[in-house]
Amino acid sequence: QGVMDKLDYLQDLGVEVVYFNPLFVSPSNHKYDIQDYDYIDPHYGKIVDDGGEVLPNGVTDNSQATKYKKRTTGLKNLEASNELFIKLVEELHRRGMKVILDGVFNHCGSFNKWMDRERIYEGEEDYEPGAYISADSPYRSYFRFFKEGPENWPYNANYDGWWGHDTLPKLNYEDSVKLENYILYIGRKWVSPPYNVDGWRLDVAADLGRSNEYNHEFWQKFRRAVKDANPNALILAEHYGDPSDWLKGDEWDTVMNYDAFMEPVTWFLTGMEKHSDEAREELLGNIDNFIGSMAHHMSNMLTPSLQVAMNELSNHDHSRFLTRTNHMVGRVEHLGPEAANEYVNKAVMREAVVMQMTWVGAPTVYYGDEAGVCGFTDPDNRRTYPWGHEDQELIAFHKEAIRIHKEHPALKTGSLKILS
């Protein structure tokens, strides 16, 4: 509802596409630990049936979080939240805007109903037992357990987690056709009526599966499933490094453009690494390095992918670009949040925005960048939007730069020539 209330602002700014970080049910603020792929989180959507209690102080047993359980497992709340999302997409489409959802398909969360490590769904009549709960769970093959003997159940915590995180159980596609089919169904579901989303951004897409061969096989299937349901849906992947193996026309459409935009621009204009973890004076203003890096990485993408690549200055995984202009190396836990706002250079920020709005690709503004929001890397980069305290001059600059980008086709589909 909050997004719906601010659509006039987004439209006036010139926004044509809204990319959401994960919206599905999840216990975290970032929601990259999905609990239920079928429903929008009622804390974002609509809570129509409330009750229960929050965890008492000092209690860590989430099965006792009866208020959370009621909010996130009750069908009334889940269905009401999906209905509200349908209305949001309809309103965005009415305004000529598009919607991209974040698809986290490499792993889920320990709260997920398929695993249920937190025992949120245990004993609930509308849900099957999770793989953590029972060796006979219909979802057991969805995960890879290191100890498979029956004596390890109930409550088998010996499973594979993404990068070893037990809160992020890695999905075991190779051993479960049922899982593969379900995720392909999810890919179709949200781009189809009544939801009609316009595309997917795929989280850590190259990590999915246990082999490179299966990874490519899955994304080929995913593309067919999504494009059969909605031929115009965009498939955009998070990827670091050369994406060319996935951009041959049968897997991803394009990528978040770290290598051929965010990183070279950041080094050139600020001399900073994109997390603010390192400063390299020799790269600041180094035109040869900038052009060489851009040319090399752009050559890894064919023109159709390059023209829609997500060109960001900031996002939810890295420090805010405006903070990088202060040349402070470090993170919020060491420097404190106020340091992110100090000694920033808005002139350099404006230079970056001009490059963003005129370079080959799809300029993508991280919420709040246009209003002067600062922040070190995750989680400090996810501050709330400063309603009533925006940098109006910076907003006006963004608005004008966006207008110029939209009014000149050459900035969207023209070729690039470097004048040396």
Regions found by a protein language model. Name each.
Residues 24, 41-44, 105, 175, ...:
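Short, flexible loop/turn elements at secondary-structure junctions
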